[in-house]
Amino acid sequence: MNQAIRGKTAIVGIGSAGIGEAHGFSPIELLGQASLKAIADAGLKLSDIDGVFAATSSHAFPTLSVCEYLGIKPKFVDGTNVGGSSFEMHLLQATLALEAGLCNAALICYGSNQRTAGGRLVSMSEPQWHETFYKPRHPITSYSLAASRHMYQYGTTREQLAEVAVSARKWANLNPEAFARGPLSIDDVMASRMVSDPLTSADCCLVTDGGGACVLVRADRARDLPNEPVYFLGAAGAQWHRSVVCMPDLTVTAASESGPRAMDMAGVTHADVDLVMLYDAFTINTILFLEDLGFCPKGEGGRFVQDGRIAPGGALAVNTNGGGLSCVHPGMYGMFLIIEAVTQIRRQAGERQLGKCDIALLHGNGGTLSSQVTAFLGSAAAL
């Protein structure tokens, strides 16, 4: 059990900007607004930031662009981009850098204006030579293949996929910042426009704008800052393929590897987890990740989510902000998993606040079920 860095760093500031529609703002401006909010929330100054971790879908050299825009001359940077899971990976990398003394205050940040820039839900994250002949729509076609295989192999139904979207919407209806609110039934999901069989438009994540950021420092410093520290407990990443045609099994993701390693580092069991934040780009994601992370046996995910089990008041709190399906999804969603987990652990989530939230599992996904990164955050009570 490798717990050498467990509890050594903490998130002390979070910020978001332009959630939903942010007309007139560029990706770097939304990133900058969120970053300044996170730094202020931490009780720090911009000049205190000496480590920058960024991944964007609009900059080839994200840390160069971010640091120039914000006017930071950092001691350490990392621009690792493994898709939407990058920010969970950045939690681990920032912790390592802080513990090694390479920086003293680390900013993790992201921004996108995908919605108001007219972006569609498409991705170039696949090596196109594998699939171009078949004219797929990336990334939806790849996820629909996984959903179809799961339905064929385990008897998962479209109604069970719809349960995921309905549960997410129920959480979103408790979140005033969520972009999509209002009633949504299983029948509504089933009747919505078919995009890539078996996934309808309501099975697919939103296309929104949004910027997000968080600030980490070493644990000893965190105790002297204004907010209750939210401690890094552990993280691990795994990747088995890039193109979905190279995925070993369409029903098993590398979360089955990253999850146990992260859980081992964090020193927690499933029973300890109060909040599960999953990258729900599509309804099948939630089902696959609940299985692969060990909350239910393989093939049981569809039945597991039935009857409001992951909705407000259910047995397992999943995606309490409304997720990528109903809250926010500006191209890369992983940053917003962190923001919601911190909000819940700080007990600042308003109407959707969980009664107990000391340990949160965050799981990021990149590419087409390609990059999987699991992380754990916790309150002081979790140490």
Name the predicted role of every residue range.
Residues 1-25, 163, 194-257, 261, ...:
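Condensing-enzyme catalytic core mediating Claisen C-C bond formation in acyl metabolism
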Residues 252-256, 260-283, 292, 325-329:
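Extended C-terminal subregions enriched in glycine
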Residues 59-69, 244-248, 280-303, 314, ...:
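Short glycine/threonine-rich loop-to-helix capping motif typified by GTGT followed
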